[in-house]
Structure formats: C-alpha cells, structure tokens
C-alpha cells in the first residue's frame, strides 16, 4: 500500500481491480500454491502516462492530501474502517493482544501474541524478519529489484553510499508484506549496529506534467549495516512509501536474535536483506520457488535457512 493510503485506494479501486496482476505464493503449511491479487498497471499507467493522471498524481502526493489522509487515520473516525478491513483480509484477531484501539493507525500496528510466533533456540538457524512473502536472489552485478513500483540496482537501493562488492555472489532476500500481514519486524540474528542511514523518498517530473516526460520515483528507505554473531556482516533495508514516514525503527547499538527491530505504518511494506557468499544455506523450498518466481509465505521468527 503506497503513500496514497486509503484515499488513493478508494479513488482508484477500479483501476487497480481492472489492471490487477496475480502473484503466485507457496504456503509452507499446506504445501500448496495460491494466487494473490496485486495492484496492476492500469492505474499506474493512468497516473504516470497521461496529462490528467499527472495532475491527479500531483494532488495525491502533495503535502495536503498526505496530511489529510494521515489525520483521518489518526482520528477516532477511522475506527469504522477496522471491521471491514478485518473481514476483507481474513485477519484472525485472536492472534493479537487485545487493545483499546484509538484509531486505524493504532490498529494497523497492533502487537501479536508472543506464543503465536515461536522462535528456534538454535543459533545457527536464520529466521524470517517478518510475516511476508519472500523471494531469494543470487547477488550479481546486474541484479535489479522492482519494489513498490520502483526498480533499483542494489547500489541504488542504498543510494550509492556503500561499497557492496563484498556481497558479490551472496544472497539477496526480499520480504514483501501485504496489508493482511503483521507489520512488525525483527533481527534475524544477534549482533551490533555498524551504521544506520535514512534515504528520503521523492517524485518529480522533468520540466513538465506532459506525458512525454518521465516521472522519477524513489521510495523512502532506511538501511542498517549489522555485524551478526553467526552470519557475518549483513545489510538490512526497509522500504517505505515515497514522501512520508512509514518506517519506525528502534535504533540500538546491540540487539538479540528475534528482538523487534521496528514496524511499518500504513504505506511501508518491504524488507531487503543482503548476505555475503557462503554464509547462508536457504531452505530448499525457498530456493526452488524463487527460481520459478514463486514467493514463499513465511512468518515472523520462522526458520528459513542455516549457517553454511
């Protein structure tokens, strides 16, 4: 879900339904695949490639709409959205700590019961940072990732501010969260923080709103370089929306495996983790599914690989 939040989604539901694409996802519990509808290209083509669409886009991403949408989701009036959201996304509220939600944003960042996300005690096992759908890639010089409608090389993902050569031939794990997922995320191993950086999002057209000029969109990102106890140095990247703060990180010098690292508010929903070569053996189902471009559904704290 992008920065347009509920306003964008209600306004452009028809475009998203008409242009939706189906993503194939593997369920590890049932060992079956299912399809999930994703926002399609029709709405985006209208917004980015037509004069009327670009006029609308300027309004949607402007500070006025963003603030108005944020204020609504922070108000008590947004509570009316919760029952419909729970039903539509088939959310089992028995899994979550019972709270007196003050608004929709309060509900969206709800906390899950600890026993619902157990964690292995084996220090050599690598765990999923979040409830999500994961794809694994080998890190090559020409690897490109498409995340929330933007395409990046790994260097672009960290704003060309890091030397990532030491991760060549390693693993790139992309964890995509959908609105029905638990939006808190954790550390996959114990260790210490080496560096943290914030990259603001932006969107602009060159000279004109005319459809012949390209729109350049960059999502807000935060990344941490972590020295872990069992998997050497890793890069941990959170990807949010374009121009609003949807990532909330608990920045700390040291951390333990499975400890909460932060959470996404409405609009932030992707984690990318880079690991060095010969550090991680991923579970076979994730490897095989990724080769076929099938996402594997995983849970917060769930084991997804082991120390090589």
Give a label for each model feature.
Residues 2-4, 8-308:
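Contiguous, well-folded functional domains in the mature portion of proteins
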């Amino acid at each position: 879900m992008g920065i347009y939040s509920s306003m964008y989604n209600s306004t452009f539901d028809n475009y998203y339904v008409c242009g939706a694409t189906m993503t194939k996802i593997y369920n590890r519990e049932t060992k079956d695949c299912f399809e999930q509808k994703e926002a399609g290209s029709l709405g985006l083509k209208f917004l980015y490639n037509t004069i009327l669409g670009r006029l609308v886009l300027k309004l949607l991403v402007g500070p006025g709409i963003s603030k108005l949408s944020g204020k609504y989701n922070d108000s008590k009036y947004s509570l009316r959205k919760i029952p419909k959201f729970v039903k539509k996304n088939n959310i089992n509220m028995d899994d979550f700590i019972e709270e007196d939600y003050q608004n929709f944003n309060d509900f969206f960042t709800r906390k899950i019961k600890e026993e619902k996300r157990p964690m292995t005690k084996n220090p050599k096992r690598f765990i999923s940072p979040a409830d999500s759908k994961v794809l694994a890639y080998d890190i090559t010089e020409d690897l490109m990732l498409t995340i929330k409608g933007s395409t990046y090389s790994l260097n672009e993902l960290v704003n060309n501010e890091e030397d990532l050569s030491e991760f060549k031939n390693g693993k790139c794990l992309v964890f995509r969260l959908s609105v029905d997922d638990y939006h808190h995320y954790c550390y996959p191993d114990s260790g210490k923080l080496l560096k943290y950086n914030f990259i603001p999002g932006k969107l602009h057209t060159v000279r004109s709103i005319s459809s012949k000029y390209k729109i350049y969109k960059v999502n807000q990102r935060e990344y941490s370089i972590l020295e872990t106890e069992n998997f050497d140095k890793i890069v941990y990247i959170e990807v949010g929306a374009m121009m609003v703060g949807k990532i909330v990180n608990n920045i700390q010098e040291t951390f333990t495996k499975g400890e909460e690292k932060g959470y996404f508010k409405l609009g932030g929903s992707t984690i990318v983790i880079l690991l060095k070569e010969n550090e991680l053996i991923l579970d076979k189902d994730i490897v095989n599914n990724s080769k076929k471009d099938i996402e594997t559904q995983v849970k917060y704290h769930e084991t997804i690989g082991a120390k090589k």
